[in-house]
């Protein structure tokens, strides 16, 4: 492998930024050379800027401790140092939209963990195992931005990872109505129990904006590129209704899901479809790709966070409790790691796919 690509992390001091830095330690293709954050962190070493707010289980990588944090708003300066950036900035949606496009216009590809551009019509929102072909919309985005290399690509919300891959694996049976409730970990809010003591022994039945994302984002992932409109057009079905609940768990989003199918399958057909489902990342053997994307667990008391959340290093999806339902056809429970597959890990896999497809190259 030739020289590694130089990576910048925008918003490197927050929880998702820290997860990017942890995941990219010893990455075979990418090397974190630049970290940018808010003006108050700029000028300090990364170690100083984070201080006692390091939230990962593993220690801070030695290689990043002495990196001097740059001001994320000094776009030209940061862009000059890197081949591409991961974005985990904490700003308003409008500010994020603007700054990510500014980076793209410096001919620096942006792979974002933020929601700001998820509905920008020519921005691909990708789960690499599900819709890698959506990256082809980048050529239309580059036309609009007037760039040759620069673009923005995003990954979808963490909440949908526990059921959207499962429904994709069952596409041939035509699911048309889906009811789900997600039970979401506190790290999804960038918090630990130390930061958020009121979550201990508590449940909060509301997460702002999350239900709409959980209902609509899968349809965009299942959509197609309209070459006349130069954009991604979402799919019309299945209809999804969702409730999102914050639960006292550190990592891992669980979903209880009920599904109606146009062609009602057998249990064996459903399980076989899950176990056999894989995608382009597995074919290409991308560094962060799980060998097994979805596992089905036979035991009645699985999937469990404590046993299953780190399946395939947090990049795999665990499914269990598949059984016939009295109102719907089938029901199941899904589990995914919200800050690995659901956030930074999913974005790293997107970047690996973009490199393999030739969209991200050395400057």
What label would you give each PLM region?
Residues 2-205, 239, 311, 317-318, ...:
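N-terminal Rossmann-like NAD(P) cofactor-binding subdomain of oxidoreductases
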Residues 187-363:
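Charged docking surfaces used in two-component/phosphorelay signaling
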